[in-house]
């Protein structure tokens, strides 16, 4: 298992990828129809009318459509639509046959878009909670600098004691190795040790 900082970096990279995929999906599959303006903001209507509207899902697009730059990098709804059930398969095949290959993807229906939007939001929240957890288990997150320095000194002392024990064991191992070498030398010369059990 990787250390906490590596896990944290991986989660941050995944969160950035999820942000990109979410924005790509939202910009690609939203129909860009104007929202209902809030009653307290009367100037919102002219701003909303400036947003270009994607063609509706039922209307086939003409051959003059251009590629959408974010469409290739964004999530496509094919796997989710195919997994939705066999009843949607003929309808999806018919829609894909009507649409030219170079046309941008059609916007999702409002219900599908809302469902996927919630799923993407849930995934972002889960990833953010993973990041918060990893940050909370980092050492020293709840201690002062002086406490951290004291802990470092304690760990250094423990390390010194363990290193001394390791050195003593190494010296003992070396001594026992020399003793075994001496016994093997005596056996090879045939003096001092008999082979009878």
From Swiss-Prot:
Keywords: Activator, Coiled coil, Nucleus, Transcription, Transcription regulation. Residues 60-70, 90-100 have a biased composition (Low complexity). InterPro entries: Med7/Med21-like, Mediator_Med21. One of its GO terms (cellular component) is mediator complex. GO terms for biological process: regulation of transcription by RNA polymerase II. It is found in: Nucleus. GO terms for molecular function: transcription coregulator activity. The keyword Nucleotidyltransferase does not apply. This is Mediator of RNA polymerase II transcription subunit 21. The lineage of its organism: Eukaryota, Fungi, Dikarya, Ascomycota, Pezizomycotina.
């Amino acid at each position: 298992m990787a250390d906490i900082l590596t896990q944290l970096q991986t989660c941050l990279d995944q969160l950035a990828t999820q942000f990109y995929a979410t924005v790509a999906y939202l910009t690609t599959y939203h129909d860009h129809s104007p929202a209902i303006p809030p009653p307290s903001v009367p100037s919102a209507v002219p701003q909303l009318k400036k947003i270009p509207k994607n063609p509706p899902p039922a209307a086939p697009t003409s051959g003059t459509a251009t590629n959408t730059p974010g469409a290739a990098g964004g999530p496509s709804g094919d796997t989710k639509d195919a997994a939705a059930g066999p009843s949607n398969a003929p309808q999806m095949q018919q829609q894909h046959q009507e649409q030219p290959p170079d046309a941008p993807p059609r916007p999702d229906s409002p219900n599908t878009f809302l469902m996927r939007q919630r799923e993407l939001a849930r995934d972002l929240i889960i990833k953010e909670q993973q990041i918060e957890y990893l940050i909370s288990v980092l050492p020293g997150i709840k201690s002062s600098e002086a406490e951290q320095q004291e802990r470092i000194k304690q760990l250094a002392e423990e390390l010194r004691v363990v290193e001394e024990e390791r050195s003593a064991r190494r010296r003992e191992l070396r001594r026992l190795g020399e003793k075994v070498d001496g016994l093997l030398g005596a056996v090879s010369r045939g003096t001092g040790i008999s082979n009878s059990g």
